[in-house]
Amino acid sequence: MSRVFAYCRVSTLEQTTENQRREIEAAGFAIRPQRLIEEHISGSVAASERPGFIRLLDRMENGDVLIVTKLDRLGRNAMDIRKTVEQLASSDIRVHCLALGGVDLTSAAGRMTMQVISAVAEFERDLLLERTHSGIARAKATGKRFGRPSALNEEQQLTVIARINAGISISAIAREFNTTRQTILRVKAGQQSS
């Protein structure tokens, strides 16, 4: 007979897994206390690196069932979640996600659901990258500068270029402006590329 386990995770110590436990009970699952793993750890940590999840994997056997309230309990992103579900499926452990109607993620329908979710996540990631690149290009076109401010203002940079053209050493110029040689070399390189 299949044993039923539950994995509940929250990100901070101020949060509680109580709502997740109640949701699992309301769905009709009576989880024994020793089969309920509760963890306070950031969702940005891969499931394979979470102490509680590792303990859960050590306790589970072929034919067991794992219940989670939401997919994000199983990993930090779509790829991590898929890897976790595949790892569990390879051990013949079924995974049910209540937020997806209790579908078994290791079944054909569950795998299809996972593929759709992965595709949507990839699409969202691509859109975010596209918007980021577009925003950077727009900012550059309006003259926005990126990075930290220059150590030397425009007037100082013009003086540095004049000193370089006069044959004064880079080290002497750096000492004069109380800055690094690298800063003076950057001013020189910027002047040469203009």
From Swiss-Prot:
Role noted for this protein: Resolvase catalyzes the resolution (a site-specific recombination) of the cointegrated replicon to yield the final transposition products.
Q: Which UniProt keywords apply?
A: DNA integration, DNA recombination, DNA-binding, Transposable element
Q: Which InterPro entries match?
A: Homeodomain-like_sf, Recombinase_CS, Resolv_N, Resolvase-like_N_sf, Resolvase_HTH_dom, SSR_resolvase
Query: What SUPFAM superfamilies does the annotation carry?
Result: Homeodomain-like (SSF46689), Resolvase-like (SSF53041)
Matches recorded under Pfam families: HTH_7, Resolvase
| Top-level taxon in the UniProt lineage | Bacteria
Which residues carry the record's DNA-binding region feature?
170-189
**Record domain Resolvase/invertase-type recombinase catalytic: where:** 3-143
Q: Which family does it belong to?
A: Belongs to the site-specific recombinase resolvase family.
| UniProt-listed GO biological process terms | DNA integration
Query: Which positions are catalytic residues?
Result: 11
Any further remark recorded for this protein: Tn2501 is a cryptic class II transposon found as part of the lactose transposon Tn951.
Q: Can you provide one Gene Ontology molecular function annotated for this UniProt record?
A: DNA binding
Output this protein's name: Transposon Tn2501 resolvase
